[in-house]
Amino acid sequence: MGCWGRNRGRLLCMLLLTFMFMVLEVVVSRVTASLAMLSDSFHMLSDVLALVVALVAERFARRTHATQKNTFGWIRAEVMGALVNAIFLTGLCFAILLEAVERFIEPHEMQQPLVVLSVGVAGLLVNVLGLCLFHHHSGEGQGAGHGHSHGHGHGHLAKGARKAGRAGGEAGAPPGRAPDQEPDQEETNTLVANTSNSNGLKADQAEPEKLRSDDPVDVQVNGNLIQESDSLESEDNRAGQLNMRGVFLHVLGDALGSVIVVVNALVFYFSWKGCTEDDFCVNPCFPDPCKSSVELMNSTQAPMHEAGPCWVLYLDPTLCIIMVCILLYTTYPLLKESALILLQTVPKQIDIKHLVKELRDVEGVEEVHELHVWQLAGSRIIATAHIKCEDPASYMQVAKTIKDVFHNHGIHATTIQPEFASVGSKSSVVPCELACRTQCALKQCCGTRPQVHSGKEAEKAPTVSISCLELSENLEKKPRRTKAEGSVPAVVIEIKNVPNKQPESSL
Protein backbone atom coordinates (compact mmCIF):
# COMPACT_ATOMS: atom_id res chain seq x y z
CA MET A 1 0.00 0.00 0.00
CA GLY A 2 2.90 2.31 0.75
CA CYS A 3 4.47 1.74 -2.64
CA TRP A 4 1.12 2.31 -4.32
CA GLY A 5 0.74 5.59 -2.43
CA ARG A 6 4.20 6.75 -3.50
CA ASN A 7 3.66 5.81 -7.14
CA ARG A 8 0.21 7.38 -7.16
CA GLY A 9 1.54 10.68 -5.77
CA ARG A 10 4.35 10.78 -8.31
CA LEU A 11 2.01 9.99 -11.18
CA LEU A 12 -0.52 12.65 -10.16
CA CYS A 13 2.18 15.30 -9.73
CA MET A 14 3.73 14.49 -13.09
CA LEU A 15 0.32 14.35 -14.76
CA LEU A 16 -0.57 17.87 -13.62
CA LEU A 17 2.76 19.38 -14.70
CA THR A 18 2.74 17.55 -18.03
CA PHE A 19 -0.78 18.63 -18.95
CA MET A 20 -0.13 22.30 -18.15
CA PHE A 21 3.12 22.35 -20.06
CA MET A 22 1.59 20.52 -23.03
CA VAL A 23 -0.95 23.32 -23.50
CA LEU A 24 1.84 25.92 -23.31
CA GLU A 25 3.98 24.13 -25.90
CA VAL A 26 1.10 23.74 -28.36
CA VAL A 27 0.42 27.49 -28.27
CA VAL A 28 4.08 28.51 -28.55
CA SER A 29 4.84 26.02 -31.34
CA ARG A 30 2.03 27.44 -33.46
CA VAL A 31 3.17 31.01 -32.88
CA THR A 32 6.87 30.39 -33.54
CA ALA A 33 6.54 27.67 -36.25
CA SER A 34 8.92 25.35 -34.37
CA LEU A 35 8.69 21.71 -35.43
CA ALA A 36 10.82 20.55 -32.52
CA MET A 37 8.47 22.18 -30.02
CA LEU A 38 5.40 20.89 -31.84
CA SER A 39 6.75 17.34 -31.75
CA ASP A 40 7.61 17.80 -28.09
CA SER A 41 4.05 18.97 -27.40
CA PHE A 42 2.69 15.87 -29.14
CA HIS A 43 4.97 13.81 -26.98
CA MET A 44 3.63 15.63 -23.93
CA LEU A 45 0.12 14.65 -25.03
CA SER A 46 1.25 11.05 -25.27
CA ASP A 47 2.70 11.38 -21.78
CA VAL A 48 -0.64 12.59 -20.44
CA LEU A 49 -2.33 9.51 -21.87
CA ALA A 50 0.48 7.29 -20.60
CA LEU A 51 0.21 8.67 -17.08
CA VAL A 52 -3.55 8.15 -17.09
CA VAL A 53 -3.05 4.56 -18.25
CA ALA A 54 -0.40 4.05 -15.56
CA LEU A 55 -2.74 5.38 -12.86
CA VAL A 56 -5.55 3.08 -13.97
CA ALA A 57 -3.19 0.11 -14.23
CA GLU A 58 -1.74 0.78 -10.78
CA ARG A 59 -5.25 1.01 -9.36
CA PHE A 60 -6.37 -2.29 -10.87
CA ALA A 61 -3.10 -4.03 -10.02
CA ARG A 62 -3.78 -3.46 -6.31
CA ARG A 63 -6.68 -5.92 -6.60
CA THR A 64 -4.51 -8.98 -6.12
CA HIS A 65 -7.21 -11.00 -4.33
CA ALA A 66 -8.35 -13.91 -6.44
CA THR A 67 -12.05 -13.98 -7.24
CA GLN A 68 -14.17 -16.54 -9.00
CA LYS A 69 -14.14 -14.33 -12.09
CA ASN A 70 -10.45 -13.37 -12.01
CA THR A 71 -8.53 -16.20 -10.41
CA PHE A 72 -5.25 -14.29 -10.77
CA GLY A 73 -6.71 -10.94 -9.76
CA TRP A 74 -5.75 -7.91 -11.87
CA ILE A 75 -2.01 -8.45 -11.57
CA ARG A 76 -1.56 -8.26 -15.36
CA ALA A 77 -3.18 -4.82 -15.60
CA GLU A 78 0.22 -3.17 -15.28
CA VAL A 79 1.66 -5.32 -18.05
CA MET A 80 -1.24 -4.25 -20.24
CA GLY A 81 -0.60 -0.62 -19.30
CA ALA A 82 3.06 -0.96 -20.24
CA LEU A 83 2.08 -2.38 -23.64
CA VAL A 84 -0.38 0.46 -24.27
CA ASN A 85 2.27 3.03 -23.32
CA ALA A 86 4.79 1.47 -25.67
CA ILE A 87 2.27 1.45 -28.53
CA PHE A 88 1.39 5.11 -27.90
CA LEU A 89 5.06 6.07 -27.96
CA THR A 90 5.76 4.07 -31.12
CA GLY A 91 2.82 5.64 -32.95
CA LEU A 92 3.96 9.09 -31.86
CA CYS A 93 7.45 8.43 -33.22
CA PHE A 94 6.07 7.65 -36.67
CA ALA A 95 3.91 10.81 -36.59
CA ILE A 96 6.97 12.94 -35.78
CA LEU A 97 8.95 11.17 -38.51
CA LEU A 98 6.36 12.10 -41.15
CA GLU A 99 6.37 15.72 -39.98
CA ALA A 100 10.18 15.82 -40.18
CA VAL A 101 10.15 14.48 -43.76
CA GLU A 102 7.69 17.22 -44.70
CA ARG A 103 10.02 19.83 -43.19
CA PHE A 104 12.87 18.54 -45.33
CA ILE A 105 10.75 19.15 -48.42
CA GLU A 106 9.42 22.54 -47.30
CA PRO A 107 11.71 24.11 -44.67
CA HIS A 108 10.28 26.77 -42.37
CA GLU A 109 12.02 29.63 -40.63
CA MET A 110 11.66 29.74 -36.85
CA GLN A 111 9.99 32.83 -35.41
CA GLN A 112 11.06 34.32 -32.06
CA PRO A 113 13.78 31.81 -31.16
CA LEU A 114 14.25 33.36 -27.70
CA VAL A 115 10.67 32.42 -26.77
CA VAL A 116 11.30 28.89 -28.00
CA LEU A 117 14.52 28.77 -25.98
CA SER A 118 12.85 29.86 -22.74
CA VAL A 119 9.99 27.39 -23.13
CA GLY A 120 12.45 24.61 -23.95
CA VAL A 121 14.49 25.31 -20.82
CA ALA A 122 11.33 25.28 -18.69
CA GLY A 123 10.26 21.99 -20.26
CA LEU A 124 13.68 20.51 -19.60
CA LEU A 125 13.38 21.42 -15.92
CA VAL A 126 9.97 19.73 -15.72
CA ASN A 127 11.31 16.59 -17.35
CA VAL A 128 14.37 16.51 -15.10
CA LEU A 129 11.95 16.62 -12.16
CA GLY A 130 10.08 13.68 -13.68
CA LEU A 131 13.32 11.74 -14.16
CA CYS A 132 14.12 12.30 -10.50
CA LEU A 133 10.69 10.95 -9.54
CA PHE A 134 10.95 7.80 -11.67
CA HIS A 135 14.72 7.24 -11.89
CA HIS A 136 14.54 3.98 -9.87
CA HIS A 137 12.46 2.44 -12.69
CA SER A 138 15.01 3.28 -15.37
CA GLY A 139 16.56 -0.05 -16.38
CA GLU A 140 15.38 -2.83 -14.14
CA GLY A 141 15.09 -6.06 -16.05
CA GLN A 142 11.84 -7.67 -15.07
CA GLY A 143 11.52 -11.38 -14.65
CA ALA A 144 15.19 -12.01 -15.30
CA GLY A 145 16.02 -12.90 -11.73
CA HIS A 146 15.16 -15.83 -9.55
CA GLY A 147 13.48 -14.48 -6.48
CA HIS A 148 13.10 -16.75 -3.46
CA SER A 149 10.32 -14.86 -1.75
CA HIS A 150 7.07 -16.76 -2.09
CA GLY A 151 3.83 -16.86 -0.24
CA HIS A 152 1.28 -16.86 -3.00
CA GLY A 153 -0.59 -20.11 -3.19
CA HIS A 154 -3.87 -21.62 -4.18
CA GLY A 155 -5.01 -25.19 -4.14
CA HIS A 156 -7.09 -27.09 -6.66
CA LEU A 157 -9.02 -30.01 -5.22
CA ALA A 158 -9.32 -33.20 -7.13
CA LYS A 159 -12.71 -34.72 -7.63
CA GLY A 160 -11.87 -37.48 -5.19
CA ALA A 161 -10.86 -34.93 -2.57
CA ARG A 162 -14.12 -33.04 -2.97
CA LYS A 163 -16.09 -36.27 -2.56
CA ALA A 164 -14.19 -37.11 0.58
CA GLY A 165 -14.93 -33.64 1.94
CA ARG A 166 -18.63 -34.06 1.36
CA ALA A 167 -18.55 -37.40 3.18
CA GLY A 168 -17.10 -35.76 6.26
CA GLY A 169 -13.49 -36.74 5.67
CA GLU A 170 -10.50 -34.55 5.02
CA ALA A 171 -8.66 -34.77 1.75
CA GLY A 172 -4.94 -34.30 1.97
CA ALA A 173 -2.75 -32.12 -0.15
CA PRO A 174 0.89 -32.64 -0.90
CA PRO A 175 2.83 -31.98 2.26
CA GLY A 176 4.35 -28.54 2.19
CA ARG A 177 6.50 -26.59 4.57
CA ALA A 178 5.81 -25.86 8.17
CA PRO A 179 3.71 -22.82 9.11
CA ASP A 180 6.75 -20.98 10.34
CA GLN A 181 8.24 -21.32 6.86
CA GLU A 182 5.25 -19.82 5.11
CA PRO A 183 7.14 -16.96 3.39
CA ASP A 184 9.18 -19.57 1.51
CA GLN A 185 6.18 -21.66 0.55
CA GLU A 186 5.69 -22.64 -3.05
CA GLU A 187 2.44 -22.88 -4.91
CA THR A 188 2.33 -26.48 -6.05
CA ASN A 189 -0.97 -28.05 -7.00
CA THR A 190 -1.49 -31.73 -7.67
CA LEU A 191 -4.64 -33.37 -8.90
CA VAL A 192 -4.31 -36.37 -6.57
CA ALA A 193 -5.51 -36.36 -2.98
CA ASN A 194 -3.46 -38.02 -0.26
CA THR A 195 -6.05 -39.49 2.07
CA SER A 196 -3.46 -40.45 4.66
CA ASN A 197 -2.66 -36.84 5.44
CA SER A 198 -4.93 -35.41 8.12
CA ASN A 199 -3.74 -31.85 7.74
CA GLY A 200 -4.95 -31.30 4.21
CA LEU A 201 -7.30 -29.25 2.13
CA LYS A 202 -10.86 -29.00 3.34
CA ALA A 203 -13.60 -29.12 0.80
CA ASP A 204 -15.75 -26.06 0.47
CA GLN A 205 -19.33 -26.91 1.44
CA ALA A 206 -20.81 -23.51 0.59
CA GLU A 207 -23.67 -23.46 -1.86
CA PRO A 208 -22.65 -22.28 -5.34
CA GLU A 209 -25.50 -19.80 -5.62
CA LYS A 210 -24.35 -18.00 -2.49
CA LEU A 211 -20.93 -17.33 -3.94
CA ARG A 212 -20.48 -14.25 -6.05
CA SER A 213 -17.84 -13.75 -8.69
CA ASP A 214 -16.43 -10.70 -6.92
CA ASP A 215 -16.01 -12.39 -3.54
CA PRO A 216 -12.38 -13.06 -2.64
CA VAL A 217 -11.41 -16.71 -2.51
CA ASP A 218 -9.73 -17.88 0.70
CA VAL A 219 -6.88 -20.21 -0.10
CA GLN A 220 -5.73 -22.97 2.21
CA VAL A 221 -2.55 -24.95 1.76
CA ASN A 222 -1.93 -27.81 4.20
CA GLY A 223 -4.81 -26.54 6.32
CA ASN A 224 -3.30 -23.07 6.81
CA LEU A 225 -4.87 -19.91 5.43
CA ILE A 226 -2.47 -18.03 3.21
CA GLN A 227 -2.48 -14.31 3.98
CA GLU A 228 -1.02 -11.36 2.12
CA SER A 229 2.59 -11.16 3.26
CA ASP A 230 5.50 -8.82 2.74
CA SER A 231 6.94 -11.24 0.21
CA LEU A 232 3.71 -11.09 -1.79
CA GLU A 233 3.81 -7.30 -1.75
CA SER A 234 7.38 -7.40 -3.00
CA GLU A 235 6.22 -9.65 -5.85
CA ASP A 236 3.50 -7.13 -6.71
CA ASN A 237 6.03 -4.32 -6.63
CA ARG A 238 8.29 -6.17 -9.05
CA ALA A 239 5.32 -6.80 -11.31
CA GLY A 240 4.49 -3.09 -11.29
CA GLN A 241 8.00 -2.04 -12.36
CA LEU A 242 7.19 -2.79 -16.00
CA ASN A 243 4.37 -0.26 -16.05
CA MET A 244 6.42 2.39 -14.23
CA ARG A 245 9.30 1.74 -16.60
CA GLY A 246 7.01 2.72 -19.46
CA VAL A 247 6.27 5.99 -17.68
CA PHE A 248 10.00 6.58 -17.21
CA LEU A 249 10.62 6.07 -20.93
CA HIS A 250 7.95 8.64 -21.73
CA VAL A 251 9.57 11.16 -19.40
CA LEU A 252 12.99 10.37 -20.87
CA GLY A 253 11.62 10.98 -24.34
CA ASP A 254 10.25 14.33 -23.18
CA ALA A 255 13.65 15.26 -21.77
CA LEU A 256 15.31 14.44 -25.09
CA GLY A 257 12.71 16.52 -26.89
CA SER A 258 13.36 19.47 -24.60
CA VAL A 259 17.11 19.19 -25.19
CA ILE A 260 16.50 19.20 -28.94
CA VAL A 261 14.28 22.29 -28.62
CA VAL A 262 16.97 24.14 -26.63
CA VAL A 263 19.80 23.17 -29.00
CA ASN A 264 17.79 24.08 -32.06
CA ALA A 265 16.77 27.45 -30.63
CA LEU A 266 20.38 28.31 -29.65
CA VAL A 267 21.79 27.35 -33.06
CA PHE A 268 19.07 29.25 -34.89
CA TYR A 269 19.48 32.36 -32.75
CA PHE A 270 23.27 32.61 -33.19
CA SER A 271 23.70 31.21 -36.74
CA TRP A 272 20.69 32.24 -38.78
CA LYS A 273 20.76 35.59 -40.59
CA GLY A 274 17.28 36.36 -41.68
CA CYS A 275 15.74 39.14 -43.71
CA THR A 276 14.65 42.39 -42.12
CA GLU A 277 11.70 44.51 -43.15
CA ASP A 278 13.84 47.48 -44.28
CA ASP A 279 16.21 45.58 -46.57
CA PHE A 280 15.60 43.81 -49.84
CA CYS A 281 16.39 40.16 -49.13
CA VAL A 282 16.09 36.84 -50.88
CA ASN A 283 15.92 33.48 -49.14
CA PRO A 284 17.58 30.79 -51.29
CA CYS A 285 16.52 28.08 -48.85
CA PHE A 286 12.89 28.18 -49.91
CA PRO A 287 11.69 26.12 -52.90
CA ASP A 288 11.35 28.98 -55.48
CA PRO A 289 13.75 31.84 -54.72
CA CYS A 290 14.22 32.90 -58.36
CA LYS A 291 10.77 34.40 -58.82
CA SER A 292 11.00 36.64 -55.78
CA SER A 293 14.54 37.81 -56.62
CA VAL A 294 13.58 38.70 -60.22
CA GLU A 295 10.63 40.76 -59.01
CA LEU A 296 12.81 42.60 -56.51
CA MET A 297 15.53 43.33 -59.07
CA ASN A 298 13.00 44.72 -61.53
CA SER A 299 11.34 46.96 -58.98
CA THR A 300 14.43 48.61 -57.51
CA GLN A 301 18.18 48.88 -57.86
CA ALA A 302 18.79 48.65 -54.09
CA PRO A 303 21.44 46.19 -52.82
CA MET A 304 20.19 42.68 -52.22
CA HIS A 305 20.76 40.61 -49.07
CA GLU A 306 20.68 36.84 -48.84
CA ALA A 307 19.35 34.90 -45.83
CA GLY A 308 21.15 31.89 -44.53
CA PRO A 309 22.86 29.59 -43.97
CA CYS A 310 20.35 27.04 -45.18
CA TRP A 311 21.65 24.15 -43.09
CA VAL A 312 20.16 25.80 -40.00
CA LEU A 313 16.65 25.21 -41.36
CA TYR A 314 17.38 21.50 -41.82
CA LEU A 315 18.77 21.13 -38.32
CA ASP A 316 15.28 21.07 -36.80
CA PRO A 317 13.96 18.01 -38.71
CA THR A 318 17.34 16.27 -38.46
CA LEU A 319 17.33 16.50 -34.66
CA CYS A 320 13.72 15.28 -34.65
CA ILE A 321 14.70 12.16 -36.60
CA ILE A 322 17.55 11.51 -34.15
CA MET A 323 15.08 11.82 -31.27
CA VAL A 324 12.72 9.36 -32.99
CA CYS A 325 15.52 6.81 -33.38
CA ILE A 326 16.47 7.12 -29.71
CA LEU A 327 12.86 6.75 -28.60
CA LEU A 328 12.29 3.69 -30.77
CA TYR A 329 15.51 2.14 -29.48
CA THR A 330 14.45 2.61 -25.85
CA THR A 331 10.80 1.65 -26.43
CA TYR A 332 11.36 -1.58 -28.35
CA PRO A 333 12.53 -3.65 -25.33
CA LEU A 334 9.47 -2.55 -23.31
CA LEU A 335 7.12 -3.31 -26.21
CA LYS A 336 8.70 -6.71 -26.79
CA GLU A 337 8.76 -7.72 -23.12
CA SER A 338 5.16 -6.76 -22.38
CA ALA A 339 3.90 -8.35 -25.60
CA LEU A 340 5.71 -11.63 -24.91
CA ILE A 341 4.25 -11.76 -21.39
CA LEU A 342 0.72 -11.31 -22.72
CA LEU A 343 1.39 -13.93 -25.40
CA GLN A 344 2.38 -16.31 -22.58
CA THR A 345 5.68 -17.31 -24.12
CA VAL A 346 8.33 -19.13 -22.14
CA PRO A 347 10.39 -16.58 -20.15
CA LYS A 348 13.83 -15.99 -21.62
CA GLN A 349 15.61 -17.11 -18.45
CA ILE A 350 13.94 -20.56 -18.57
CA ASP A 351 15.74 -23.25 -20.58
CA ILE A 352 12.77 -25.46 -21.43
CA LYS A 353 14.89 -28.29 -22.89
CA HIS A 354 17.05 -28.48 -19.79
CA LEU A 355 13.92 -28.37 -17.60
CA VAL A 356 12.32 -31.30 -19.45
CA LYS A 357 15.56 -33.27 -19.20
CA GLU A 358 15.75 -32.73 -15.44
CA LEU A 359 12.12 -33.73 -14.98
CA ARG A 360 12.60 -36.94 -16.97
CA ASP A 361 15.72 -37.76 -14.97
CA VAL A 362 13.74 -37.76 -11.72
CA GLU A 363 13.51 -41.27 -10.31
CA GLY A 364 10.01 -42.63 -10.72
CA VAL A 365 9.07 -40.41 -13.69
CA GLU A 366 8.40 -42.32 -16.89
CA GLU A 367 7.25 -39.52 -19.17
CA VAL A 368 6.66 -35.74 -19.17
CA HIS A 369 4.25 -34.13 -21.60
CA GLU A 370 1.88 -31.14 -21.85
CA LEU A 371 4.53 -28.98 -20.15
CA HIS A 372 3.63 -25.29 -20.30
CA VAL A 373 5.63 -22.47 -18.74
CA TRP A 374 4.61 -18.82 -18.88
CA GLN A 375 5.09 -15.57 -17.01
CA LEU A 376 2.12 -14.03 -15.23
CA ALA A 377 3.75 -10.69 -14.31
CA GLY A 378 7.05 -9.58 -12.89
CA SER A 379 8.89 -12.62 -11.52
CA ARG A 380 5.76 -14.77 -11.16
CA ILE A 381 6.29 -17.77 -13.41
CA ILE A 382 3.70 -20.54 -13.69
CA ALA A 383 4.09 -24.08 -14.99
CA THR A 384 1.73 -26.99 -15.65
CA ALA A 385 2.70 -30.51 -16.65
CA HIS A 386 1.46 -34.07 -17.03
CA ILE A 387 3.80 -36.42 -15.16
CA LYS A 388 3.55 -40.14 -15.84
CA CYS A 389 4.63 -42.22 -12.83
CA GLU A 390 4.90 -45.89 -12.05
CA ASP A 391 2.40 -46.18 -9.20
CA PRO A 392 0.46 -43.94 -6.78
CA ALA A 393 2.42 -45.16 -3.75
CA SER A 394 5.64 -43.41 -4.75
CA TYR A 395 4.01 -40.37 -6.31
CA MET A 396 4.19 -38.03 -3.30
CA GLN A 397 7.95 -38.42 -3.04
CA VAL A 398 8.24 -37.89 -6.80
CA ALA A 399 6.09 -34.75 -6.51
CA LYS A 400 8.45 -33.29 -3.90
CA THR A 401 11.43 -33.85 -6.17
CA ILE A 402 9.59 -32.35 -9.13
CA LYS A 403 8.72 -29.33 -7.01
CA ASP A 404 12.40 -28.82 -6.18
CA VAL A 405 13.31 -29.03 -9.87
CA PHE A 406 10.81 -26.30 -10.73
CA HIS A 407 12.01 -24.23 -7.78
CA ASN A 408 15.62 -24.39 -8.98
CA HIS A 409 14.48 -22.96 -12.31
CA GLY A 410 12.66 -20.05 -10.64
CA ILE A 411 9.16 -21.52 -11.08
CA HIS A 412 7.19 -21.46 -7.85
CA ALA A 413 3.57 -21.80 -9.02
CA THR A 414 3.14 -25.28 -10.46
CA THR A 415 0.22 -27.57 -11.23
CA ILE A 416 1.06 -31.23 -11.77
CA GLN A 417 -1.38 -33.74 -13.22
CA PRO A 418 -0.17 -37.25 -12.37
CA GLU A 419 -0.72 -40.20 -14.66
CA PHE A 420 -0.06 -43.77 -13.60
CA ALA A 421 1.00 -46.39 -16.10
CA SER A 422 -1.52 -49.11 -16.84
CA VAL A 423 -0.57 -52.76 -16.52
CA GLY A 424 1.53 -53.78 -19.50
CA SER A 425 1.56 -50.32 -21.09
CA LYS A 426 4.71 -48.59 -22.25
CA SER A 427 5.37 -44.87 -22.41
CA SER A 428 6.37 -45.10 -26.05
CA VAL A 429 3.13 -46.84 -27.02
CA VAL A 430 0.68 -44.91 -24.84
CA PRO A 431 2.25 -41.49 -24.15
CA CYS A 432 -0.84 -40.12 -22.40
CA GLU A 433 -2.90 -42.23 -20.01
CA LEU A 434 -5.61 -39.54 -19.81
CA ALA A 435 -5.96 -38.54 -23.43
CA CYS A 436 -8.71 -36.22 -24.60
CA ARG A 437 -11.59 -37.38 -26.76
CA THR A 438 -11.22 -36.96 -30.50
CA GLN A 439 -13.66 -34.05 -30.69
CA CYS A 440 -11.54 -31.97 -28.31
CA ALA A 441 -8.06 -33.29 -29.11
CA LEU A 442 -7.35 -30.50 -31.59
CA LYS A 443 -8.46 -27.88 -29.05
CA GLN A 444 -5.72 -28.73 -26.59
CA CYS A 445 -2.77 -26.42 -26.07
CA CYS A 446 -0.42 -28.74 -27.94
CA GLY A 447 -2.99 -30.37 -30.26
CA THR A 448 -2.63 -34.12 -30.60
CA ARG A 449 -2.68 -34.27 -34.38
CA PRO A 450 -1.79 -37.53 -36.15
CA GLN A 451 1.71 -37.76 -37.57
CA VAL A 452 1.95 -36.72 -41.22
CA HIS A 453 3.66 -39.22 -43.51
CA SER A 454 5.06 -38.45 -46.92
CA GLY A 455 5.56 -40.52 -50.08
CA LYS A 456 5.27 -44.28 -49.83
CA GLU A 457 5.02 -44.12 -46.05
CA ALA A 458 1.61 -42.45 -46.40
CA GLU A 459 0.27 -45.46 -48.33
CA LYS A 460 1.58 -47.99 -45.83
CA ALA A 461 0.80 -46.10 -42.65
CA PRO A 462 -2.83 -46.53 -41.57
CA THR A 463 -4.68 -43.55 -40.17
CA VAL A 464 -5.66 -44.23 -36.56
CA SER A 465 -7.38 -41.62 -34.41
CA ILE A 466 -8.68 -42.98 -31.13
CA SER A 467 -8.38 -41.82 -27.57
CA CYS A 468 -7.81 -43.79 -24.39
CA LEU A 469 -11.37 -43.15 -23.23
CA GLU A 470 -12.90 -44.36 -26.51
CA LEU A 471 -10.72 -47.45 -26.43
CA SER A 472 -11.90 -48.33 -22.95
CA GLU A 473 -15.54 -47.74 -23.94
CA ASN A 474 -15.23 -50.03 -26.97
CA LEU A 475 -13.59 -52.75 -24.90
CA GLU A 476 -16.34 -52.66 -22.31
CA LYS A 477 -18.98 -53.48 -24.95
CA LYS A 478 -19.63 -57.17 -25.59
CA PRO A 479 -18.55 -58.28 -29.06
CA ARG A 480 -21.31 -59.36 -31.43
CA ARG A 481 -20.72 -62.36 -33.61
CA THR A 482 -22.16 -62.41 -37.10
CA LYS A 483 -22.81 -65.41 -39.32
CA ALA A 484 -19.62 -64.83 -41.23
CA GLU A 485 -17.68 -64.95 -37.99
CA GLY A 486 -19.13 -68.29 -36.90
CA SER A 487 -15.89 -70.15 -37.49
CA VAL A 488 -13.73 -67.46 -35.89
CA PRO A 489 -13.31 -67.78 -32.13
CA ALA A 490 -14.28 -64.65 -30.26
CA VAL A 491 -11.84 -63.02 -27.88
CA VAL A 492 -13.55 -61.28 -25.00
CA ILE A 493 -11.60 -58.76 -22.97
CA GLU A 494 -13.06 -58.09 -19.58
CA ILE A 495 -12.14 -54.97 -17.67
CA LYS A 496 -12.73 -55.16 -13.97
CA ASN A 497 -13.03 -51.97 -11.99
CA VAL A 498 -10.93 -52.44 -8.89
CA PRO A 499 -11.98 -49.81 -6.36
CA ASN A 500 -9.51 -47.78 -4.30
CA LYS A 501 -6.56 -49.05 -6.33
CA GLN A 502 -5.93 -45.85 -8.27
CA PRO A 503 -7.09 -42.42 -7.16
CA GLU A 504 -9.37 -40.54 -9.46
CA SER A 505 -7.88 -37.63 -11.37
CA SER A 506 -9.68 -34.62 -12.70
CA LEU A 507 -8.85 -33.09 -16.07
UniProtKB/Swiss-Prot annotation:
Q: Consequence of mutating H43A?
A: Loss of zinc export across plasma membrane and no effect on localization to the plasma membrane
The UniProt activity regulation field reads: Calcium-dependent.
Q: Name one Pfam family in it.
A: Cation_efflux
One of the entry's Gene Ontology molecular-function terms is: zinc:proton antiporter activity
Task: Give start-end positions of Basic residues composition bias.
Answer: 147-165
- Alphabetized Gene3D superfamilies for the sequence: Cation efflux protein transmembrane domain
Q: Which residues are glycosylated?
A: N298
Which residue ranges are assigned to the Extracellular compartment in the record's topology?
32-35, 100-113, 269-307
Give residues annotated as binding Zn(2+).
H43, D47, H250, D254
Membrane-crossing residues?
A: 11-31, 36-56, 79-99, 114-134, 248-268, 308-328
Parts of the chain on the Cytoplasmic side: 1-10, 57-78, 135-247, 329-507
Q: InterPro entries from the xrefs?
A: Cation_efflux, Cation_efflux_CTD_sf, Cation_efflux_TMD_sf
Please give the residue ranges the record annotates as the region Disordered: 140-218
Induction field: Slightly by zinc in the intestine, but not the liver.
Q: Which GO terms describe its biological process?
A: cadmium ion transmembrane transport; calcium ion import; defense response to bacterium; detoxification of cadmium ion; detoxification of zinc ion; in utero embryonic development; intracellular calcium ion homeostasis; intracellular zinc ion homeostasis
Swapping D254A leads to an effect described as: Loss of zinc export across plasma membrane and no effect on localization to the plasma membrane
Q: Which reaction does it catalyse?
A: Zn(2+)(in) + 2 H(+)(out) = Zn(2+)(out) + 2 H(+)(in)
Purpose: Zinc ion:proton antiporter that could function at the plasma membrane mediating zinc efflux from cells against its electrochemical gradient protecting them from intracellular zinc accumulation and toxicity. Alternatively, could prevent the transport to the plasma membrane of CACNB2, the L-type calcium channels regulatory subunit, through a yet to be defined mechanism. By modulating the expression of these channels at the plasma membrane, could prevent calcium and zinc influx into cells. By the same mechanism, could also prevent L-type calcium channels-mediated heavy metal influx into cells.
PANTHER family hit by this protein: FI23527P1, PROTON-COUPLED ZINC ANTIPORTER SLC30A1
Provide the assembly information.
Answer: Homodimer. Interacts with TMEM163. Interacts and forms a complex with TMC6 and TMC8; the interaction regulates zinc transport into the ER.
The UniProt similarity line reads: Belongs to the cation diffusion facilitator (CDF) transporter (TC 2.A.4) family. SLC30A subfamily.
Please give the name of this protein.
Answer: Proton-coupled zinc antiporter SLC30A1
Organism of provenance:
Rattus norvegicus (Rat)
* Lineage, broadest ranks: Eukaryota, Metazoa, Chordata, Craniata, Vertebrata
